[in-house]
Amino acid sequence: MGKKKIATLSAILSLSITSGVSSTTAYADNKETNYINENDVKLNGKVSEALQSNMKIELENGMTKPIYSLDEAIIENLFVETEVDSDRDGKKDRVSVKVMRPKTDSNVKVPVIYEMSPYRAGLKDVPVYNVDEELYAYEGKPYGAVNLGSYGNYYVPRGYAVILGESIGTGKSEGCPTTGDEQEILGTKSVIDWVNGRAKAYKENGEEVKADWSTGNVGMTGVSYNGTLPNAVATTGVEGLKTIIPIAAISSWYDYYRANGAVIAPGGYQGEDTDNMAEAVLTRENPEVCGQVIKELTAGQDRKTGNYNDFWDKRNYVKDAKNVKASVFVVHGLNDWNVKTKQFAQWWEALGENNVPRKMWLHQGGHGGTSTNDWQRTQNKWFDYWLYGIENGIMNEPMVDVQRENKTWDKMKNWPDPSAVPSKVRMYLSNKAVNLPLSMGSVNKMFSFVDDAKMKSNQLVANPELEVANRLVYTMPVLQKDTRISGTPKISITGNIDRSVSNLTALLVDYGGAKPEIVTRGWMDPQNVKSIENSTAIQPGKDYTFTWDMQPDDYVFKAGHQIGVVLMASDYDYTIRPKAGTKLTVKLSEVTLPIVK
């Protein structure tokens, strides 16, 4: 597909984190009280006795409190040697990092909070893909010198070092951006290796610098791409990485740019893909040396078919959850249409299957974190527990916090809600909204709709009682009580297409408020009827059964409202937008909702 400059990537994924009590001092001094003997300090065994004797902190409410001066903070700009050569110049790439740490006595050691980012040197405006074209039919900026930033300003006074890095190919770092593959992972991992004495770092003048001030314990965090890299590095099982807090983070890049074989955009960034993402963050000197790497991204992502292949498999962290040794605190917005909710849901499930210590917050915001629910305090306690070994009760809290639509928070043992039951509803087909029984029924009608990619979803969900040629609408009876879903809705339809290619889109809609609200949605390429790995030639007019998932959600439909399902072909904001006219005929439709009993 050719490229056309119809938008820029000036803000791709880029977000910053919104972010009278007795005290106890625990410190190392040969002539004073040893940390481990402090009666008021409860330890959890996460830090060895040897390290405990080299730490100096003061606690308040079970958390580290600020005791170190920001004005005296030590700041170093260094280059850490990685084990990769992503720009293929015959030399190991070096990544640029800023290290900020408290000024301490020489025998005091501190843990590290670490964020790697491709965004520190800004983003370039690059062309993205033109999505107004036909579908493919299968045939057979440098750091500021004195600003410690939000992490540094908060955590350095509390006895933490903060390391901010520039990922390969960005800013002052060497190498080439590779959008989430092993080279990017290992480039990020190298900083943890350096903190633990397994890699080397240098000043700009070539002088080697050791991290002899560190305990070796590292916690990674970040939002969006910056939160994705912690997920990725955790799958290496690297020694020293004790915990991660991925916020609005990707767990599989395929599910960021594809859905069931369909080419899908991140919300707000139509036409974006792995190659122009890499181009946007390619802010190193001499970016032309990465030309071949970008070409390989273009080829590997296979935008033509949308199939899952080895390229995507290398960027799928979910399958490697078995290697995760760090604890994980997931934070995600239930209304995030950039990094969609499947990203947290599949990661959370995989972590649970592998007995990874975990915690999760799901908030009502979009792409980013949350400042509500006493977030900063909780983050502080989490890092203290895993990096300083403070027993502060954080792991005794319910594992999941979910923010409700009215902004209150519910605490849960797990997610999806263990009380959620997959409930199938076979829908009588009509081009008008009808009250449907919540039980199976015989169906002997069929109805058709015609694709028009220029019609936006808010138009297609409106006025469900009217016949509209470009959609089918089904509504269930008016709800007699609040009805909550928790998990992943699924759709299954039987029917045919009059062409060999189309998009398929399903919307789950809340009818009954001031205006229809799209709760969640899902997409499919019908040519992936058998698997996401392989396309199957679709015979026009032949009946097939297509089944696909919508994005996971936790949502309450209010009493007096109606649950609706809208079927359409192309989705203006997310799918490729082919010319109008494809006719789809549906003979049977069934939705499965994870209803909390």
Curated annotation (Swiss-Prot):
Alphabetized GO MF terms: aminopeptidase activity; dipeptidyl-peptidase activity; serine-type peptidase activity
Coiled-coil segments: none
Lineage top rank: taxon: Bacteria
Active-site feature positions: S224 (charge relay system), D336 (charge relay system), H367 (charge relay system)
Biological process according to GO: proteolysis
Enzyme Commission numbers on file: 3.4.14.11
Pfam families, per database record: Peptidase_S15, PepX_C
InterPro entries: AB_hydrolase_fold (IPR029058), CocE/Ser_esterase (IPR005674), Galactose-bd-like_sf (IPR008979), Pept_S15_Xpro (IPR008252), Xaa-Pro-like_dom (IPR000383), Xaa-Pro_dipept_C (IPR013736)
Catalytic reaction annotation: Hydrolyzes Xaa-Pro-|- bonds to release unblocked, N-terminal dipeptides from substrates including Ala-Pro-|-p-nitroanilide and (sequentially) Tyr-Pro-|-Phe-Pro-|-Gly-Pro-|-Ile
Keyword field contains Protease: yes
Keyword field: Aminopeptidase, Hydrolase, Protease, Serine protease
Keyword field contains ATP-binding: no
Family: Belongs to the peptidase S15 family.
Name recorded for this polypeptide: Putative Xaa-Pro dipeptidyl-peptidase
Organism: Bacillus anthracis
